[in-house]
Amino acid sequence: MVKVLQLCFLSAISLVQALNSTVDQKDEAKVDINTVFDNDSTNFCRMDKTEAIGATCDVTFHEINEVNNNIRPQLLSLVQSDFFKYFKLDLYKECPFWSDNNGYCVNRACAVDVVEDWDSLPEYWQPEILGNIENATTDITDDECSFLDELCDKPRFEAEKDIEYCDTNDFNSQHSVLVDLTANPERFTGYGGEQSSQIWSSIYKENCFSLGDENQCLAKDAFYRLISGLHASIGTHLSNEHLNTETGKWEPNLELFMTRVGNFPDRVSNIYFNFAVVAKALWKIRPYMNELGFCNAYNEDVKGMIDGVVSQLNSKVFNEDLLFHDEVSGQLKDDFRIRFKNVTKIMDCVQCDRCRLWGKVQTTGYATSLKILFEMDNDDDVARQHVVDKLTKYELIALFNTFDRLSKSVEAVNRFEEMYNYQLKSPGEKLASFFQLDNFFKVLNDKFNSANHSSQEKESVSNVEKKVNEFNDLKMPEKKKETHTEVREQASGVFKEAWDVEWKNFKQALRFIVTSYTDLPSTVSKYTVLKLNKLWNKFIGVPNYLEEGEELEYPSYNYEE
């Protein structure tokens, strides 16, 4: 095995040296780096940024980038304010779809720090006033006069239909806890594997609608793009906040981003699509913001930041009227609502607490957006106000935090694009990133270094600092012949040591078998005498012989040795 690794490593060295010599000889021949790395294998943002995002959007990628650059500072300050940085959820709610509890994340990065010092919170976050704050029309009182006044002055909404796209009862659960989102940032936790794949597989399977009408294509496409955009946005966040094990810092990881998002233009496009959806919801609810009861808790600075963000949005970013516009589409809208509600419930199956937290925040934010877009489609202002009155403070908090997450994703996508283009402009950097991405040469180098570790300690290495295009991660032995000989000798020593261990184990096993056979006659004879003695005493009339006399001592064996 060592020889195989050695040969593979030597082949890798030859390839690297050949590539380096080709790049360094600029006067003799120039290499077009795109011939080594075909552009078809790297699909980062291969789209026309001047085109519209989709059939339901009248906005381009470039326009969203400009809007995001303008609102990003105020939006970041807004979600870090006292009102918008807290969220309430049940971290221990059981999964309603399956009972697989084998995927718990025991990593510290998966944990969530909940709020315990309530005295440090503002007044509107104290326990006695937490919960839904609704309009007076929804308050239930025992005062008959108040009830009659309400009937006379306010419209009645009989047979009220379900307009919820998420389970709002979770906010009032006795098991729910308050969490500071700024103290629990969304970042890479190491959670994944089969359990994570099961979560996303179940979410994507919700895109199976019962109706077969051709008009549902736009709705199905919108549903899929929402889920895909959510998935891609989360992947972007985790790639942007990835732990560098060498420096111990959280920093962008271009390779991880390209693997999850960058090599798939449709995923990048769906992030922008989700940005447009949530932006349209914020634009649509703007006229009613001051009429929300809990909005009185804002200070003037927060109100100014909200207006500063929402005022830069417009209605053309998303046209929800194209999705549901007739009776058949009304049934499709109910199916759409139920299925997205299931998506929010699937987040209760996530076994990583921090992943569940941000999954709940973002799915609740999307659910709130859909409720605003699809349920406020009536021209009646009173009916619109009724929908607004059904909003809770946690839905509004989730809405703005989800918009912040999408804004962060758009910002990160542009940063990753700059990093990607920077590597393309430098041939040495591009070659180095290629080998680091595959990690093949790094594995070979680690195997080779572990085999000749003792020989490398004896060698003195000069010229420690080299250029990046000289492949610093490949440690070239200076004396190949001597190093190969020493490696061969050490490999022989390792083989001899392994042989000695196996031979010792074989002798011990053989000794055990032989001893068992040699002791068999003695063991059988003792057992026979014991049985005959018991039968004889029973024959001569000694009752309960073994119980009345001393107990016989059986030979003891230590099975743990």
From Swiss-Prot:
Keyword Metal-binding part of the UniProt annotation: no
EC nos: 1.8.4.-
Primary location class: endoplasmic reticulum
Signal peptide residue numbers: 1-18
Cofactor: FAD
GO biological process, one term: protein folding in endoplasmic reticulum
Gene Ontology MF term list: FAD binding; protein-disulfide reductase activity; thiol oxidase activity
Paired cysteines (S-S): 95-349, 105-110, 145-166, 152-295, 352-355
Record-level GO cellular component terms: endoplasmic reticulum membrane
Primary enzyme class: oxidoreductase
Active site: 352, 355
Membrane topology term: Peripheral membrane protein
InterPro entries in alphabetical order: Ero1, ERO1-like_sf
Binding site for FAD: 187, 189, 200, 228, 231, 260
Localization, UniProt: Endoplasmic reticulum membrane
Record: glycosylation sites: 20, 39, 135, 342, 452
Keywords: Disulfide bond, Electron transport, Endoplasmic reticulum, FAD, Flavoprotein, Glycoprotein, Membrane, Oxidoreductase, Redox-active center, Signal, Transport
Protein family (similarity comment): Belongs to the EROs family.
UniProt function note: Essential oxidoreductase that oxidizes proteins in the endoplasmic reticulum to produce disulfide bonds. Acts by oxidizing directly PDI1 isomerase through a direct disulfide exchange. Does not act as a direct oxidant of folding substrate, but relies on PDI1 to transfer oxidizing equivalent. Does not oxidize all pdi related proteins, suggesting that it can discriminate between PDI1 and related proteins. Its reoxidation probably involves electron transfer to molecular oxygen via FAD. Acts independently of glutathione.
Quaternary structure and partners: May function both as a monomer and a homodimer.
Protein's name in the database: Endoplasmic reticulum oxidoreductin-1
Taxonomic path: Eukaryota, Fungi, Dikarya, Ascomycota, Saccharomycotina
Underlying gene: ERO1
